[in-house]
């Protein structure tokens, strides 16, 4: 059905419901039973009904069981198991449809076929309750699921028939609970919506526990019948009102499909449901007055007054239009059910009213406190019930303490389910408790639902037996108990374990009905963890579908929304305000459903999880320890929650994931379900820890791994590039020689050059990524730094002998290359490796004398391209480098050769873009640095690359761009670089002055280059200007005598006329007209020419002035520049080319880095 059809059905259903509601208000006197005798609606025209029946089974098949209130009969009935198969078979559809429905219900917009939507939403109501029960009853037998479906059918009938009453009563009970129920339903729907597929599957598997779902859905059922979707949705409406609002489709689904429900059952069911819904409210009193499961007064007054009048009031309130507890609910006006729920809620909101949640919170707070204890009892009972299995006897038995407790627990379970499903408003608190009781209810819902149903009937033990769900549960539980009770027995203990925490958390959870979100976070230690575990473990379970349902059930709790729940779970411990986000509730709701999902999905790794369960606490502790060790783990609880959820994920995906290695023993340690507490803590910790393993551990370990990897990568790069790490050690020997003079300089440069070396070469990228890291491990980074000549120096120290032996051979090839390409080849490949080229020599060392020479040449080509300004110098220097590499090993004086290594420059020509990219990398590296000297070194290195880029533009005829802008911008960068370190400052070091000299020389030669690029234009301008001035002077001289004194200080009268002519003549640059001597007009073009001429010539003036300044300053650093001139050849003002300048400067920078120990 498309939306339009659903909308039409929705409108019709809305009208019908409104009428039924109005009629229902009148139809149910205070003393009248909530629901009339169940009757079977024979109308089969409804597609939804037909589909629902086909999926859920025929009422005729189930009515005897449903109608029979005796638990024994239901328990004895194996028939549900048969329907279970059918239903489970149908369940896939049911699941799909329900998913669609619940999905739609989440949206409150007609999404799927109206029938399927209504069906699915009926289912989703049932399933959501089922999810709750499923969540609670992590693993259920298909029999109970089918039975539950039949119950749903019968319930749908009772819903439909007793719809008004049940809806009213349910709305009433639900409306107190509905704020919760709606939110929980909405979250359940959203959960079930997200979890529906899994939840449905799980429900199929867990349907036995779906009795909760059934009674939930029946409780919703009343809505569902008359307002099927409305009933189902109202609960969801509350919490997800806005999102659910769009799901009027849910309203459509309550067709006549589920036609026959016994009013008794419905009423009892309603009682149980409303009790369950009011459970949170009733729980306090239900503890005291479990027998008095009188929803009306309880929900309304939170007191145990089960008067029919109260029910009527509730019904009236239900039918009454109230502001939605979640105001957003009204927005989906189209969703009639919200209308109905709201009216009910509004009526109740006399109790809860618009502040229903608040009241409900207060009522629930009061009730919640009682409910807390009840929930605790409930949890305890759930644990014991889970441990006991069904505790049908307990159900039937008054359970004075356990009974009361179990009733509360059942009511709490139901209330948790109902309040989860029907009251997600509480779902926060009951989501915590509900989550808690969900996990409890998972086991305890199957069993607690049995008791809870019996518990709600406990005031009426017969109703307990009469409860369809109870009977059904009892019926199913026999089947259920074998699979589920074992799980439950495990889970109960774990639930009991959880319950203890939950009770604590529940106390806060119930204490904060409004803070139900917080209650989840209130019980973050366990509830949140449990929820998170559930949610995250749910994930894990989804991952490992193979795991047993029981294990999965619990673990799958939060699977559907594992990530959300994780975050919320992690956040829940902090804020836990997730009800609206539905994460806690969703987690609570999704936890059971996810458990089923996990049961279904997570079943693939059941052994691991069970085993993990066996070592839950050790695992949890291990995980905690691991998580604690993990930096990203904020707190062990959060991490635990994360870890637990990640454990569930990890446990499921453990084998594949690294998590398995981390927690494999604890996770995989064979665990017997019997260790419930371990299982519980296992769930908490394990569920989270696998996730943590996966998410936290792997990310954490990855960063850790990455950091070492980065370092290793650098080392590899060093080996690949020049293999300087070794060389670097040798140059330090040279440095040792140099240390006396240059140690301070080296110290300063060490930091700067470390980063600069990193960024300059191939490691620039690595350095960029780990610039901070590289700075920290600069010694390592030095080895791996981009400028590995420095590294080669140190490595030469380390392997001075090797370098001595090896470098000569590499040096020879390099020498020949460099000498050949000395000036002509500005072909050095990349400035990246110019310093690396000296490392190139070291790379030669690394690779072996011959291989090293080849590698050095290769590295030179690749990375030290163009770094050797003068190859002859390089050749000379390389021989010295070998020698210098050798001498460094034998520290002599600071003589340049022994202490410094020469970079190997690549003579290959590269495109301008290649150099430009390199320059940008270096500049960006410099931008990220904090040390001013190091920053200046990097900037100057970038300047060299920019110079090479301009040179490539200049040399390449194919380049359309002029190198002038590149050089001009580079000059500005040099000016900025010089501002970083003022050589005139009192604290200026020798390294600062040397760097300044290099900057000045680059700037001077760039100015000279700029002048030469524009020299021809300047000559033209000079000629034109000279002629203009000459003509202008002659013209001005002629008229002046005639004008005499008259012209003095005044423009000639003729000048205006002449100026146009003058401009014309001047524009041609030819003759000049004379104006009065005082007013000679110069054409605009002349001004431009004059300005351009001045600019071009000023470049030459700057070049000469700056060169002189550099020469003067270099005298203070004679040794350094004498050595540099010797190695690279001196720079000559009017003769050196850009390639010479680039290589000279880069070699000087390399030494500066070495001296400053920026590279080792």
UniProtKB/Swiss-Prot annotation:
Location of the region described as Disordered in the Swiss-Prot/TrEMBL record: 1-42, 78-289, 322-908, 1031-1070
Modified residues annotated as Phosphothreonine in this record: 669
InterPro entries per record: AF4/FMR2 (IPR007797), AF4/FMR2_CHD (IPR043640), AF4_int (IPR043639)
Keyword Metal-binding among record annotations: no
Residue numbers carrying N6-acetyllysine: 817
Protein location: Nucleus; Chromosome
Residues in cross-link Glycyl lysine isopeptide (Lys-Gly) (interchain with G-Cter in SUMO2): 578
Any one Pfam family match given in the protein's UniProt record, by short name: AF-4
Listed GO biological process terms: regulation of gene expression; response to endoplasmic reticulum stress; spermatid development
Gene3D superfamilies: 6.10.250.2670
Regions of compositional bias (Polar residues) in chain numbering: 115-128, 268-280, 360-370, 398-407, 483-496, 505-523, 544-555
Observed effect of gene inactivation: Mice are infertile with azoospermia. Spermatogenesis is arrested at the level of spermiogenesis.
Compositionally skewed regions (Basic residues) per UniProt: 594-607
UniProt KW keywords: Acetylation, Chromosome, Isopeptide bond, Nucleus, Phosphoprotein, Proto-oncogene, Transcription, Transcription regulation, Ubl conjugation
Modified residues (Phosphoserine): 120, 207, 382-384, 387, 482, 485-486, 544, 666, 675, 689, 698, 701, 809, 831, 1040, 1052, 1055, 1059
Coiled coil: none
Domain of life, source organism: Eukaryota
Tissue expression profile of the protein: Highly expressed in testis by Sertoli cells, and at low levels in other tissues.
Listed Basic and acidic residues bias regions: 1-19, 193-212, 408-424, 563-581, 608-622, 725-756, 764-784, 794-806
Chain positions with Phosphotyrosine modification: 707
Ranges of compositional bias, category Low complexity: 172-189, 229-247, 425-457, 641-657, 831-859, 880-895, 1059-1070
Keyword Transcription in annotation: yes
GO cellular component terms attached to this protein's record: euchromatin; fibrillar center; nuclear body; nucleus; transcription elongation factor complex
Family to which the UniProt record says this protein belongs: Belongs to the AF4 family.
Record text on subunit structure and interactions: Component of the super elongation complex (SEC), at least composed of EAF1, EAF2, CDK9, MLLT3/AF9, AFF (AFF1 or AFF4), the P-TEFb complex and ELL (ELL, ELL2 or ELL3). Interacts with ELL2; the interaction is direct and leads to stabilize ELL2 and prevent ELL2 ubiquitination and degradation. Interacts with ELL3; the interaction is direct.
The protein, known as: AF4/FMR2 family member 4
Organism: Mus musculus
Lineage, uppermost ranks: Eukaryota, Metazoa, Chordata, Craniata, Vertebrata
């Amino acid at each position: 059905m498309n939306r339009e059809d659903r909308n039409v059905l929705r409108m019709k259903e809305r009208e019908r419901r409104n009428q039924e509601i109005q009629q229902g208000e009148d139809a149910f006197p205070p003393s009248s039973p909530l629901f009339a005798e169940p009757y079977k609606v024979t109308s089969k025209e409804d597609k939804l009904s037909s589909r629902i029946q086909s999926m859920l089974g025929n009422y005729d098949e189930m009515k005897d069981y449903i109608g029979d209130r005796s638990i024994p009969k239901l328990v004895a009935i194996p028939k549900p198991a048969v329907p279970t198969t059918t239903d489970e078979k149908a369940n896939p559809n049911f699941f799909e449809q329900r998913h669609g429905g619940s999905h739609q219900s989440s949206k409150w917009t007609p999404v799927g076929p109206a029938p399927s939507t209504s069906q699915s939403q009926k289912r989703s109501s049932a399933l959501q309750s089922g999810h709750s029960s499923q969540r609670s009853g992590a693993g259920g037998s298909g029999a109970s699921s089918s039975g539950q479906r039949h119950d749903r059918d019968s319930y749908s009938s009772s819903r439909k028939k007793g719809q008004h009453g049940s809806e009213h009563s349910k709305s009433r009970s639900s409306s107190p609970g509905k704020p919760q129920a709606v939110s929980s339903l909405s979250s359940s729907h959203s959960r079930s919506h997200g979890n529906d597929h899994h939840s449905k599957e799980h429900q199929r598997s867990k349907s036995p526990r779906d009795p909760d779902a059934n009674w939930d859905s029946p409780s919703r059922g009343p809505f569902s019948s008359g307002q099927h979707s409305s009933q189902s949705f109202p609960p969801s409406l509350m919490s997800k009102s806005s999102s659910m609002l769009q799901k009027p489709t849910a309203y459509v689904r309550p067709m006549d499909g589920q036609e026959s429900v016994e009013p008794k059952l419905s009423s009892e069911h309603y009682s149980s449901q409303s009790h369950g819904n009011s459970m949170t409210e009733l729980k306090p009193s239900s503890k005291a007055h479990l027998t008095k499961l009188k929803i009306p007064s309880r929900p309304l007054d939170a007191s145990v007054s089960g008067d029919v009048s109260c029910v009527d009031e509730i019904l009236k309130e239900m039918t009454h239009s109230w502001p939605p507890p979640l105001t957003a609910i009204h927005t989906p006006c189209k969703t009639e059910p919200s209308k109905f729920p709201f009216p009910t809620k509004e009526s109740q909101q006399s109790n809860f009213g618009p502040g229903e949640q608040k009241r409900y919170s207060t009522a629930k707070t009061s009730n919640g406190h009682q409910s807390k204890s009840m929930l605790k009892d409930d949890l305890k009972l759930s644990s014991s019930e889970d441990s006991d299995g069904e505790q049908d006897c307990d159900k039937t038995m008054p359970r004075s303490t356990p009974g009361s407790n179990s009733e509360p627990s059942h009511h709490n379970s139901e209330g948790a389910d109902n309040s989860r499903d029907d009251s997600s408003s509480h779902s926060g608190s009951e989501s915590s408790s509900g989550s808690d009781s969900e996990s409890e209810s998972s086991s305890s819902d199957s069993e607690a639902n049995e008791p809870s149903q019996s518990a709600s009937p406990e005031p009426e033990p017969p109703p307990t037996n009469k409860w369809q769900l109870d009977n059904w549960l009892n019926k199913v539980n026999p089947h259920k108990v074998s699979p589920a009770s074992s799980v439950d027995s495990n889970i109960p203990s774990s639930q009991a374990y959880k319950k203890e925490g939950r009770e604590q958390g529940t106390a806060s959870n119930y204490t904060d009905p409004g803070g139900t979100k917080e209650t989840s976070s209130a019980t973050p230690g366990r509830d949140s963890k449990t929820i998170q575990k559930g949610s995250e473990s749910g994930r894990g379970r989804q991952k490992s579908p193979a795991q047993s349902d029981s294990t999965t059930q619990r673990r799958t709790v939060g699977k559907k929304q594992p990530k959300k729940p994780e975050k919320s779970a992690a956040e829940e411990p902090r804020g836990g305000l997730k009800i609206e986000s539905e994460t806690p509730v969703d987690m609570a709701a999704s936890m059971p459903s996810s458990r089923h999902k996990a049961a279904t999905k997570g079943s693939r790794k059941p052994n691991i999880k069970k085993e993990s369960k066996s070592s839950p606490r050790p695992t949890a502790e291990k995980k905690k320890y691991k998580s604690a060790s993990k930096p990203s783990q904020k707190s062990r609880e959060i991490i635990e929650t994360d870890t637990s959820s990640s454990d569930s994920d990890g446990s499921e995906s453990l084998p594949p994931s690294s998590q398995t290695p981390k927690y494999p023993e604890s996770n995989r340690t064979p665990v017997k379900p019997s260790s419930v507490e371990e299982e519980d803590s296992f769930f908490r910790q394990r569920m989270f820890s696998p996730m943590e393993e996966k998410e936290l551990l792997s990310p954490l370990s990855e960063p850790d791994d990455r950091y070492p990897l980065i370092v290793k990568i650098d080392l590899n790069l060093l080996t690949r590039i020049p293999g300087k790490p070794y060389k670097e050690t040798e140059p330090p020997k040279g440095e040792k020689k140099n240390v006396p003079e240059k140690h301070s300089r080296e110290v300063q440069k060490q930091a700067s050059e470390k980063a600069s070396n990193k960024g300059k070469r191939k490691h620039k990228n690595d350095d960029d990524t780990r610039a901070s890291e590289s700075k920290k491990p600069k010694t390592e980074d030095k080895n791996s730094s981009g400028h590995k000549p420095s590294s080669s120096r140190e490595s030469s120290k380390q392997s001075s002998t090797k370098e001595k032996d090896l470098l000569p051979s590499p040096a020879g090839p390099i020498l020949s290359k460099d000498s050949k390409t000395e000036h002509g080849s500005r072909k050095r490949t990349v400035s990246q490796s110019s310093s690396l080229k000296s490392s190139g020599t070291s790379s030669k060392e690394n690779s072996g004398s011959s291989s090293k020479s080849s590698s050095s040449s290769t590295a030179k080509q690749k990375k030290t391209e163009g770094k050797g300004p003068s190859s002859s110098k390089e050749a000379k220097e390389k021989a010295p480098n070998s020698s210098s590499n050798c001498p460094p090993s034998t520290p002599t004086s600071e003589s340049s050769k022994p202490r410094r290594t020469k970079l190997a420059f690549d003579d290959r020509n590269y495109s301008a873009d290649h150099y430009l990219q390199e320059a940008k990398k270096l500049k960006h590296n410099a931008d990220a640095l904090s040390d001013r000297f190091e920053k200046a070194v990097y900037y100057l290195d970038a300047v060299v690359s920019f110079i090479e880029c301009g040179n490539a533009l200049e040399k390449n005829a194919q380049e359309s761009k002029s190198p002038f802008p590149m050089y001009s911008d580079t000059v500005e960068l040099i000016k900025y670089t010089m501002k970083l370190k003022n050589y005139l400052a009192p604290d200026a070091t020798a390294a600062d002055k040397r760097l300044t000299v290099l900057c000045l020389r680059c700037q001077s030669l760039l100015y000279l280059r700029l002048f030469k690029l524009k020299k021809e234009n300047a000559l033209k301008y000079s000629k034109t200007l000279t002629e203009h001035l000459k003509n202008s002077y002659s013209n001005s001289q002629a008229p002046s005598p005639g004008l005499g004194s008259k012209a003095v200080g005044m423009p000639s009268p003729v000048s205006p006329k002449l100026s146009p002519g003058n401009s014309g003549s001047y524009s041609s640059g030819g003759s000049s007209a004379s104006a009065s001597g005082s007013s000679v007009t110069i054409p605009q073009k002349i001004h431009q020419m004059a300005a351009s001429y001045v600019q071009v010539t000023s470049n030459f003036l700057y070049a000469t002035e700056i060169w002189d300044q550099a020469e003067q300053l270099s005298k203070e650093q004679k040794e350094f520049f004498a050595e540099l001139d010797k190695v690279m050849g001196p720079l000559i003002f009017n003769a050196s080319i850009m390639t010479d300048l680039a290589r000279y400067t880069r070699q000087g920078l390399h030494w500066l880095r070495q001296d400053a120990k920026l590279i080792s």
